[in-house]
């Protein structure tokens, strides 16, 4: 079965489950569990998202337990029943772990909780304004010199740095004589900060959602060769729930299914939490208070554990 067919079937299965939950709306409050155990890798986006979700469900009568686990371990604990949900199912980056859990029938894919996620060759906006919009242009010798024939990336051995190394080895976009400069993520972003301060040309591995987008006005170049994946590096960021948990807790499953943000919204709160080093609870609380329309969408048809209006309960807590 090809990837597209598998993804389509996954979506259909997820929608079938949620449709069944929606039809069971009169019984939505009768969840089996009063606790939601969230897999939270040490990434700023999912850290804030998980806190937002925790602040949504606590006034409804549930307890949120945030488990500090890597994504790989998280897929294992979702299968073993030691975790309940995960808000950072990045695909195709986690495809192997995701496919194994799906094949075991252990998880339900509730779809994307972030729209507009993408990764690829990134540049500051002033480079785009100078006419550079596609990675294909890196093959131009004059343009290559402007970038000092260097692409900055994150940790050596990471999936995305391996993708860059493969592109250099295969001379994709004329990168055969370029250097791939792997570093820590903070190290790479320090190079970006220094270049932007002087309006120097720089190309680096970038992704959205991330605070680099608003901070450095980052743009991602077209990637027709698919160095960073198909469809110009567009990514899915899935809400993944342990299947037994979703079936036993239709009220929370509905909320999880409706929990969706834009990449720009997530980039903004990542910036506040990670770059400005603000308290995650304060960032989450202020975000909820400032986005009543999203709050209403998250909680449509959802009730408190004792059958009362969920939106009123959350608003009273903010």
Question: What are the residue ranges of the model-derived segments?
Answer:
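A bilobed periplasmic-binding-protein/Venus flytrap-type ligand-binding module shared by bacterial periplasmic
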Residues: 119-129, 235-248, 271-272
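Short, polar/charged alpha-helical segment
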Residues: 44-63, 169
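C-terminal functional modules
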Residues: 114, 260-318
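Short helix-initiation/N-cap motifs at beta->coil->alpha
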Residues: 41-44, 62-77, 179-191
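A conserved helix-loop-strand patch within extracytoplasmic ligand-binding domains
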Residues: 106-155
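Ligand-binding pocket segment of bilobal, Venus flytrap-like solute-binding proteins
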Residues: 83-87, 156-225
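Pocket-flanking alpha-helical
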Residues: 50, 70-105, 191, 211-217
């Amino acid at each position: 079965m090809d990837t597209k067919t598998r993804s389509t079937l996954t979506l259909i299965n997820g929608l079938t489950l949620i449709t069944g939950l929606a039809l069971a709306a009169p019984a939505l409050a009768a969840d089996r569990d009063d606790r939601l155990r969230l897999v939270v890798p040490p990434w700023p986006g999912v850290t804030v998202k998980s806190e937002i979700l925790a602040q949504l469900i606590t006034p409804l009568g549930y307890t949120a337990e945030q488990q500090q686990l890597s994504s790989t371990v998280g897929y294992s604990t979702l299968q073993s029943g030691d975790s309940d949900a995960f808000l950072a199912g990045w695909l195709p980056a986690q495809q192997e772990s995701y496919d194994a859990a799906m094949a075991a029938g252990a998880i339900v894919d509730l779809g994307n909780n972030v729209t507009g996620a993408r990764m690829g060759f990134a540049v500051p906006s002033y480079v785009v304004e100078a006419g550079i919009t596609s990675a294909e242009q890196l093959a131009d010798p004059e343009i290559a010199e402007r970038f000092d024939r260097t692409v900055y990336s994150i940790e050596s051995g990471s999936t995305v740095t391996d993708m860059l190394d493969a592109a250099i080895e295969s001379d994709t976009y004329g990168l055969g004589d370029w250097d791939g400069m792997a570093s820590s993520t903070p190290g790479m972003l320090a190079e970006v900060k220094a270049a932007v301060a002087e309006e120097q040309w720089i190309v680096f591995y970038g992704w959205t959602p991330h605070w680099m987008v608003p901070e450095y006005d980052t743009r991602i170049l077209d990637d027709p060769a698919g160095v960073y994946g198909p469809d110009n590096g567009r990514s899915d960021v899935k809400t993944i729930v342990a299947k037994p948990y979703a079936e036993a807790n239709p009220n929370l499953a509905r909320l999880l299914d409706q929990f969706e943000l834009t990449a720009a919204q997530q980039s903004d709160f990542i910036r506040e939490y990670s770059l400005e080093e603000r308290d995650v609870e304060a960032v989450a609380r202020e975000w909820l208070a400032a986005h009543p329309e999203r709050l209403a969408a998250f909680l449509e048809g959802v009730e408190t554990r004792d059958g009362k209006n969920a939106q009123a309960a959350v608003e009273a807590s903010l």
